[in-house]
Regions:
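Secondary-structure boundary elements
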Residues: 65, 71-132
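Hydrophobic/aromatic-rich core segments of domains that either
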Residues: 141-182
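Sec-dependent signal peptide cleavage junction
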Residues: 15-29
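Active-site rim recognition segments
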Residues: 49-55, 127-131, 174-182
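Alpha-helix capping and helix-loop boundary segments enriched in small/acidic/polar residues
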Residues: 27-30, 70, 135-138, 162
Length: 182
């Protein structure tokens, strides 16, 4: 249960995150936020690890899957199938982001039963794009990394934001030069 105090803290953290992203962007000399902000290999709530998705999106863009594991190839094929279904020529970045957002909210449920992870139990992964796209269920980290994968595949800047205190993750997506929480 989220209390009013927790909501105020979360809003304050969101404002802090936006300011931090802007400061990182300025200190990096432009749009290099992703290079200086750590978003991968971060453990959330001691249970979920934010995994990198760049290798999969790079394979999508280049058409070269030779460096991908079988699991990553499977993830790529599932993600590509979704994009082929919802993205059309001539869409703006905003329209692409909105199409992905709508698809995810309509097709991926929140798996509250997986809030406690049993170490070594990978029977129903809900914290990574492969499991999310296969099972159509996710926890926040799964939503965030899957959304980021789609954005990377579409060439739209996106990063996973994490709050270790509240054990929560979400995305920042850059549209028309501005960062937005998603």
């Amino acid at each position: 249960v989220v209390t009013p105090v927790m909501l105020v803290l979360l809003l304050a953290l969101n404002v802090f995150t936006i300011l931090k992203v802007k400061a990182l962007e300025e200190s990096a000399g432009g749009d290099k936020t992703e290079d200086v902000a750590q978003e991968n290999d971060v453990t959330i709530g001691g249970e979920y690890v934010i995994k990198a998705t760049t290798q999969i999106s790079d394979a999508y863009k280049s058409g070269n899957t030779s460096n991908l594991s079988d699991k990553d190839k499977e993830t790529l094929n599932m993600a590509k199938s979704v994009l082929d279904e919802i993205i059309t020529d001539g869409m703006s970045d905003y329209e692409k982001e909105l199409a992905v957002y709508k698809w995810m909210t309509a097709n991926i449920g929140f798996d509250s039963g997986s809030m406690t992870v049993v170490p070594g139990d990978d029977s129903k992964p809900v914290d990574n794009p492969n499991g999310v796209l296969k099972n159509h269920e996710a926890v926040c980290v799964g939503y965030a990394t899957t959304f980021r994968l789609f954005m990377q595949m579409l060439g739209i800047d996106c990063m996973v934001v994490h709050d270790s205190y509240l054990s929560h993750s979400w995305d920042l997506v850059k549209l028309d030069g501005q960062w937005y929480h998603t």
